[in-house]
Amino acid sequence: MRIALTTVQAPFVSGGAEFLANNLKKALIDRGHEAEIVSIPFMDSPTYLIENHIVASRLFDLEHSWAGKIDLCIGLKFPAYYIPHSNKVVWALHQHRAAYDLFDTEYSNLKSNEDGQYYRNVIYNADNLYLKEAKRIYTISENVTARMRKYNRIGSTALYHPCPDAEKFYVEGYEDYILMTSRINITKRQMLAIEAMQYTKSNTKLYIVGKADNVYEKDRMLAYIKELKLGNKIKYFDYVTQEEKFKLYANAKAVLFIPKDEDYGYITLEAMESSKAVITAKDSGGPLEFVEDGKNGFIVDPTPKEIARAFDEIAMSKNLAREMGTASKKHLLEMNVSWDNVVKELTR
């Protein structure tokens, strides 16, 4: 089949969504399909752009291209999953969360005022109307499925996929550091992890890896480490190569991933591919679908002292990191998270 993958992109910004689209394209091509990513630019600030983008998405025609008929359209992101097609399935990374669970919070630019309520309703109504055009709706996790059911009463099926370069992760050992890899962003809660290091009793260190969304976020984080006098306990890597990242995973004691209500979270899968326990929080969303508390990681309250307790428990035990890490890899294999399964479902 000739398949179009519809998504959006903020120019010069790249992350998990771009990884997913590229890897889905490769998976489809590897299995005999023709596939192309159709990406449209997106900005939600100022807020009037939201409505413009929705209207623009409805004006595209993807039934044909100069190459011929397009057999299937797979919609990935708001509002590109509104693009019309007679044979469309949606595999939603997430909805526009600023209008849903993040509305009127520090994580959203839509507030509980006349302007915010207007654009929230625009998004609600568009999702309710246009998502139902799809022949089938999938999401990337049970967390996203639950949100869609809660806010829109739209049913969907969770369809898990592997993290990028899954086959390149490996395990070497369990050295005395906890690894935290995420872009530096308020929703990833690096500040909470830093604060937790005040309360650790073990000698374990925290390695933070990731580029900041902006200079302010990075400067704020580094200033906080300095303010708490934790420079000897925390190491920050602004940039690492892929090979360096694999090695950091391979030798970590465990992996910390405590985002606020994550949709999916490649970091969980990267840790499990590397045979590492995952320390996550009770409100972290996606990771909770993979982590079993006390078996292949810890699920803790999102407080500094509880996170520190988990650090110390795994750091002070001789064998716990290895035992949990082994269980982590085994659990991932049992879940059959594979591109074969994804392609089979999306193209059936």
Please describe what each predicted stretch is:
Residues 170-188, 194-201, 206-208:
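Conserved donor-binding/catalytic core segment of Leloir-type glycosyltransferases
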